[in-house]
Swiss-Prot record:
It comes from Bifidobacterium adolescentis (strain ATCC 15703 / DSM 20083 / NCTC 11814 / E194a). GO terms for molecular function: ATP binding; tRNA dimethylallyltransferase activity. It is an enzyme of class 2 (transferase). The gene is miaA. This is tRNA dimethylallyltransferase. Its EC number is 2.5.1.75. InterPro entries: Dimethylallyltransferase (IPR039657), IPT (IPR018022), P-loop_NTPase (IPR027417). Catalyzes the transfer of a dimethylallyl group onto the adenine at position 37 in tRNAs that read codons beginning with uridine, leading to the formation of N6-(dimethylallyl)adenosine (i(6)A). HAMAP family: IPP_trans (MF_00185). GO terms for biological process: tRNA modification. It catalyses: adenosine(37) in tRNA + dimethylallyl diphosphate = N(6)-dimethylallyladenosine(37) in tRNA + diphosphate.
């Protein structure tokens, strides 16, 4: 029987830990799972980092170590080969199935990952319409002949809601919107992402002063070199597909192996690009008013996170979260 502070399985929210790279998400996820276990509740981690799903890409993606995975069971790590392609639509299907499986066993899923769209795809009202190369090509040809303005005028007629949320000077997005309308027969606006949970969730964000985050990224980049990242890339390079090859750091090391740059410049570039990625991630996550931000350096981090989870399970944030989509679209605009 649940104690006064222990939630019932049917009220337990999925916990999603978000934040920039190197902010400590993996460590907090493990700590939360162990704290829940101490209260008599089982919890397991579901990876939401796009590149940690690839086998053999361990050092460059900062994958949870074997020791960390032994502490708490992890899911959706090492599930595809480097020459396979993981898309956010494919991940959404896999992740939701895994979450449902865990919940059926009364195990609380803890979603951990730095890929913002992937984390949201698992829990939010987001759909991913298919593409049609022939339709896309025809629209691109029309844009060259008629101009972007003509296509945007067509979009305003076919889907005024989508047009109102889009930049008229971005023909790529206009073409995508018209493509979706033609392929699906539905308004493009129906597929735009919403800040609306389809799986009850509480999101915890990790924040760090920029100087500390930069310091951690520098340390991590140095450790990547020391731990054999060059050898990792050399080993998997023959099987590195287009999608997996987009993981930050891998192409830089490939260029080094091809003699296009020296080792020091390679890892300096990786550190600089990682810092830029971290800024971008903070901008992405910063738009979501449902995230409960915690200072990662606070000694009381775990206790604060557990308190947020307890309040979420009690339904204390439900009313505010329900207003998030309307608030975000009104104040910040569309992000798609």
């Amino acid at each position: 029987m649940p104690s006064a502070t222990e939630s019932k399985p049917e009220t337990r929210k999925v916990v999603s830990i978000v934040g920039p790279t190197a902010s400590g998400k993996t460590g907090l996820g493990i700590a939360i799972a162990k704290a829940l276990e101490a209260k008599g509740e089982q919890a397991e981690i579901v990876n939401a980092d796009a590149y940690q799903m690839y086998k053999g890409m361990d050092i460059g993606t900062a994958k949870a170590s074997p020791e960390e995975q032994a502490e708490v069971r992890h899911h959706l790590i090492d599930i595809i080969e480097p020459d396979d392609a993981m898309s956010v639509a494919r991940f959404q299907e896999i992740a939701r199935a895994k979450i449902a499986e865990l919940q059926a066993r009364e195990v609380r899923p803890i979603l951990v990952g730095g890929s913002g769209l992937y984390a949201r795809a698992a829990i939010d009202d987001i759909s991913f319409p298919g593409t049609d190369p022939e339709v896309r090509k025809r629209l691109e040809e029309r844009e060259k002949v008629e101009g972007a303005g003509a296509l945007f005028d067509e979009l305003k007629t076919k889907d005024p809601e989508a047009a109102a949320r889009m930049d008229p000077h971005n023909p790529r997005r206009t073409i995508r919107a018209l493509e979706v309308i033609e392929v699906t027969g539905r308004p493009y606006s129906a597929s735009l992402p919403h800040y609306r949970y389809v799986i009850p969730t509480v999101q915890i964000g990790l924040d760090l002063p920029r100087e500390e985050l930069d310091r951690r990224i520098d340390i991590r980049t140095k450790q990547m070199l020391e731990n054999g990242f060059v050898e990792e890339v050399e080993r998997i390079r023959p099987r590195l597909g287009i999608t997996a090859g987009k993981a930050l750091g891998y192409q830089q090391v490939v260029d080094y192996l091809d003699g296009l740059c020296d080792l020091n410049d390679t890892f300096m570039s990786i550190a600089q690009k990682t810092k830029r990625l971290a800024r971008k991630q903070m901008g992405w996550f910063g738009r979501d008013p449902r995230i409960h931000w915690l200072q990662a350096l606070n000694p009381a981090l775990l206790g604060n996170a557990m308190a947020i989870i307890e309040h979420a399970d009690a339904g204390d944030y439900d009313a505010i979260d329900a207003q998030a989509d309307a608030y975000t679209q009104h104040h910040l605009g569309d992000i798609a």
